[in-house]
Regions:
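Short active-site oxyanion
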Residues: 42-48, 121-124, 170-172
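Short, acidic/turn-prone active-site loops that include or flank metal/cofactor-
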Residues: 27-29, 53-54, 71-78, 129, ...
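Glycine-rich, flexible N-terminal cofactor/catalytic loop recognition
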Residues: 5-75
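Glycine/small-residue-rich loop that forms an oxyanion/phosphate-binding "nest" at active or ligand-binding sites
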Residues: 84-130
């Protein structure tokens, strides 16, 4: 029985691909970074929901995927939910993709997923590329990480949000533009001065680069362009020691007080 359940998703038989909404991860830069299963699901989809049909068309052309592309982004996702759920209720296979990476991670889709959950519509993840996990994997920092999403916009919001997470003892990941990074270096230093940082530029693309330094040594970049993910390290040992007392320290203090 377990074997049969596991093989409901087998690509050897199209009829075994279950109907529902598929959250399909696509390449973040290098077109080869897509799984055979993802291609199979996209080929068998009645519709493919995507942020920008022009971008997704490059992927579907490369892999001979003929499924219809439908524009689905933050400005129309609420409006289209009823129609999408209607098609899903008709036992259709619909895929959701983003311009790059794993859908719903700082991309549209959460509203649709919540609606599918409320209507008992099947939802399946097709795992794959993610700028978040890719950047953490090469950082050399703690595997425990907090993903913030896109770096805040306004100065007051930046100050407020960073003050809330400055003491987290984990790696901290942001998506950020080159201009915004240069503009906010002093604020990053203010809240994360004792940590290390890696700046990941154009991950998996031709101009892929990684810049590593201490936050205290961070300086504005010249001619920095492209998509950027930054990973800030966990607290260093000195900072941890100043913030937390271990059990032996607590016992010693109690003895001294007595």
């Amino acid at each position: 029985i377990l074997y049969k359940i596991m093989n409901l998703h087998s690509k050897d038989n199209k009829s075994n691909l279950r109907t529902g909404l598929y959250i399909v991860s696509t390449p973040i830069g290098n077109m080869l970074d897509i799984s055979n299963r993802a291609i199979d699901v996209l080929k068998n989809s009645y519709l493919i929901l995507c942020e920008d049909t022009r971008i997704s068309k490059k992927l579907t052309l490369k892999y001979n995927i003929n499924s219809k592309l439908i524009s689905y982004h933050k400005f129309n996702e609420k409006k289209n939910i009823e129609k999408i759920c209607f098609e899903l209720k008709q036992k259709k296979i619909i895929s959701l993709i983003s311009d790059a990476g794993t859908p719903t991670i700082s991309d549209p889709g959460k509203i649709l997923i919540k609606e599918c959950i409320s209507q008992n519509i099947n939802i399946f993840p097709i795992p794959g590329p993610s700028a978040v996990t890719a950047s953490v994997s090469v950082s050399g920092f703690s595997e425990k990480y907090f993903f913030y999403g896109f770096f805040p916009e306004k100065t007051k919001e930046i100050e407020k949000k960073l003050s809330e997470i400055k003491d987290l003892d984990s790696s901290i990941v942001f998506f950020i533009s080159a201009k915004k990074l240069n503009r906010n270096i002093n604020i990053i230093k203010k809240f994360f001065l004792d940590r290390d940082i890696v700046i990941c530029k154009e991950i998996t693309k031709f101009y892929e680069e990684f810049f590593r330094c201490k936050v205290s040594d961070l300086k504005p970049f010249k001619n920095l362009k492209g998509e950027i993910t930054i990973v800030i390290s966990e607290l260093n040992n000195k900072k941890k020691a100043s913030n937390n007392l271990n059990e032996s320290d607590k016992k010693k203090i109690k003895m001294l007080v007595k």
